[in-house]
């Protein structure tokens, strides 16, 4: 821990970690499709999901090298450029990491406004001119996948690869003070041939969005890892500390903070690993993952912030000290909701699924939980990920809240009452065209809908059991649902108070405010679970 913290504070570039990745062929094994690698190589979502959490558990900066490599590899594996694919596999085997050249300083991720140009320079030849900003691994990447426009065809987008050791490639700075390298780069008339071009036109556009669609999933798992490590530190500290003659963990408000943090953290993990199952079975005919992935990115990362806030209220000033993991966690946990599209962007994306999720009764296939070795080739064949989202079927929502696990929880009935009132609002007092354009108002609507979808998968995970459902799962599920009841009540109150809400809507929002089904025995048992974690993990000093 001490060495990790020293390197974090001194912003040491992690060459030792990159050497480990090379020596153990980690990225080569995990990020090379089987068609291009050795016998253990495959793009296995279950394996990658667990590895994302593991890296986040120790260091977000080290996780970042993994995350932006996944982004950089997306357009390559999506493309039909076999020569570059084989070269990429070779670079991975040699320990290479990768970068995703999408964002620009002046335009962020506004693809339409991209200034990077690919300029024709004779038959099959081009020069690349322009700059990119906020490009992770841009200092040493084996390949940087660059999104640009053909100069003479402004509406024709293109993806091509460049190498960071080329004379016409300039990495001008690390734009953040961190171990992670987030580059500003400039291409000074970098020579490109057809060999380096990955995708053109609509295919390039779709590849940029498809890559983000599956890669942003990893941000939620990083949050799970950070929050888990922080929880261990917090309970170890609080349970051993005496104030005014009592252990900190004896105070009622501390018990409440720990219980809520525990419930939110368990929910984060249950949802994320259940959402992973939907990505594993994704196909052209089953695109439910396009809702659940943004929720992992947006909802799980926000919940991670909530967990850290509760734990920080417990350990107070200890969370600022330079020698604890928690000090880094308070900084890093806040980054994740803001990467790969802001919370607002992803929230508005989830709202597009609301009609089909809540009103479409079309039957859909059940999805099995699976940790078995598999390869998700569809992730590189998604096509357009932004079309037809409002028609993707999810099956009727009510049966999900009548499952065996759901029926065991007193808070299920309270939560369903809130959901039914929300559905009634959408039917009887639907958002007006003006309200639908009011992003502030719609974000609050999205908050409530996201809780509904979030709860549905957590209930599924509880019914399935397995490694990501806790012991005494029904007890923990009821605790989780009590948190969701309070969250919906809070958002309903916000909507009631907004000036743009109509009188009928205000009435229905007030009806959504409900008291959770409290149970002192349950609270006591949950806190026993919290205390059982004392000294179950402590990082080597």
Q: Each predicted region: which residue ranges?
A:
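Flavin-dependent oxidoreductase catalytic core characteristic
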Residues: 1-30, 34-57, 62-63, 86, ...
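Short acidic, glycine/serine/threonine-rich loops at helix termini
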Residues: 40-44, 76-77, 110-114, 138-141, ...
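N-terminal glycine-rich flavin-associated loop
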Residues: 63-83, 108-111
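Short, solvent-exposed loop/turn segments at the edges of secondary structure
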Residues: 70, 95, 111-113, 139-143, ...
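A short, Trp-centered hydrophobic/proline-enriched beta-strand micro-motif
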Residues: 94-103
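Short Gly/Pro-enriched turn/cap motifs at secondary-structure boundaries
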Residues: 106-109, 135-137, 174-181
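A short core secondary-structure module
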Residues: 125, 129-169
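Flexible, small-/acidic-enriched active-site or ligand-binding loops
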Residues: 167-191
């Amino acid at each position: 821990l001490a060495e990790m913290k020293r390197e974090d504070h001194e912003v040491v570039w992690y060459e030792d970690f990159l050497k480990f990745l090379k020596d153990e062929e980690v990225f080569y094994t995990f990020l090379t499709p089987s068609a291009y690698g050795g016998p253990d190589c495959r793009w296995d979502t279950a394996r990658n999901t667990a590895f994302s959490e593991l890296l986040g558990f120790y260091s977000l900066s080290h996780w970042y090298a993994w995350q932006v490599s996944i982004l950089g590899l997306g357009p390559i594996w999506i493309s039909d450029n076999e020569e570059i694919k084989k070269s990429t596999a070779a670079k991975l085997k040699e320990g290479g990491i990768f970068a995703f050249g999408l964002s620009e300083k002046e335009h962020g991720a506004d693809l339409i406004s991209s200034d990077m140009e690919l300029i024709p320079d004779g038959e099959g030849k081009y020069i690349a001119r322009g700059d990119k900003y906020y490009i992770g691994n841009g200092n040493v990447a084996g390949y940087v996948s660059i999104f640009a426009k053909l100069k003479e065809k402004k509406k024709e987008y293109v993806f091509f690869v460049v190498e960071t050791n080329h004379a016409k490639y300039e990495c001008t700075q690390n734009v953040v003070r961190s171990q992670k390298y987030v580059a500003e780069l400039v291409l000074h008339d970098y020579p490109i041939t057809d060999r380096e071009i990955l995708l053109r036109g609509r295919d390039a556009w779709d590849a940029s969005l498809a890559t983000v669609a599956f890669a942003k999933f990893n941000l939620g798992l990083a949050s799970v890892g950070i929050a888990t490590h922080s929880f261990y530190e917090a309970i170890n500290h609080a349970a051993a500390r005496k104030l005014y003659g009592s252990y900190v963990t004896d105070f009622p408000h501390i018990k409440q903070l720990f219980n809520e943090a525990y419930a939110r953290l368990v929910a984060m993990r249950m949802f994320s690993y259940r959402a992973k199952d939907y990505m594993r079975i994704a196909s052209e005919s089953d695109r439910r993952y396009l809702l659940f992935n943004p929720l992992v990115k947006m909802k799980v990362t926000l919940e991670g912030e909530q967990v850290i806030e509760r734990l920080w209220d417990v350990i107070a000033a200890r969370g600022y000290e330079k020698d604890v993991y928690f000090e880094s966690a308070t900084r890093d946990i806040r980054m994740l909701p803001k990467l790969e599209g802001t919370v607002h962007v992803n929230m508005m994306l989830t709202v597009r699924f609301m009609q089909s999720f809540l009103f479409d009764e079309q039957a859909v296939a059940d999805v099995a939980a699976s940790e078995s070795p598999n390869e998700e080739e569809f992730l590189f064949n998604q096509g357009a990920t932004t079309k037809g989202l409002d028609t993707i079927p999810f099956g009727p929502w009510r049966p999900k809240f009548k499952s065996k696990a759901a029926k065991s929880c007193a808070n299920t009935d309270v939560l369903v009452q809130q959901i039914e009132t929300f559905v009634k609002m959408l039917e009887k007092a639907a958002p007006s065209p003006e309200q639908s354009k009011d992003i502030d108002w719609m974000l609050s609507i999205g908050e409530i809908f996201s809780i509904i979808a979030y709860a549905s998968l957590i209930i599924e995970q509880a019914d399935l059991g397995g490694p990501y459902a806790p012991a005494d799962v029904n007890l923990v599920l009821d605790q989780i649902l009590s948190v969701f009841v309070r969250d919906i009540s809070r958002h309903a109150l916000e909507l009631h108070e907004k000036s743009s809400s109509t009188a009928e809507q205000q009435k229905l929002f007030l009806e959504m405010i409900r008291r959770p089904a409290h149970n002192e025995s349950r609270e006591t048992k949950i806190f026993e679970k919290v205390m059982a974690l004392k000294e179950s993990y402590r990082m080597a000093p």
